[in-house]
Amino acid sequence: EGYGAITSLLNDNLKQLAEGSLFYTENGNMWVMMLFLGLIILVKVLATSATNGGGGVGGTFAPSLYVGCFAGFFFAYVLNHTGLLPMELSDKNFALMGMAGVMAAVMHAPLMAIFLTTELTGGYDLFLPLMITSTVAYATIKVFEPHSIYTMRLAKKGELLTHHKDKAVLTLLKMDSVIEK
């Protein structure tokens, strides 16, 4: 279950997450943990993409939270344990920002990502970093993919109704009704 894994990461309990897997070691080797986190992110993205792309119902909300949480945690974990920065980053804060960033990008809903993550934390301490992360993620994805995951299939079929009345009417118009025989 993904929510248990998210809870483990947010409580900074990486060992509990790795227990029972091939990657569990008593001493908690950081390179093994980095590999473990990286593989989880990669496999989850591939599994969700294959399921949704194949017509199955793999969901979008929970996988977005899961991948975002793991990606943010992975980013902070790598920087903390490789000595690339002179200071220690908060794994929990980066996990939360990763959740907000991926959710804002996948669903094209930066405000929802900001407020939902703020509700999860129970405070407004991370409000500005969440705003920056969600805005950058949304602006970046908007350049590459103009439609959210929910409207993408309709747009590809040409059945997406927009807020522009003229475009919506032209979308609904059938050629058989326009051409005289």
Segments predicted by a language model, with ranges:
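Alpha-helical transmembrane segments and immediately membrane-proximal extracytoplasmic
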Residues: 1-176
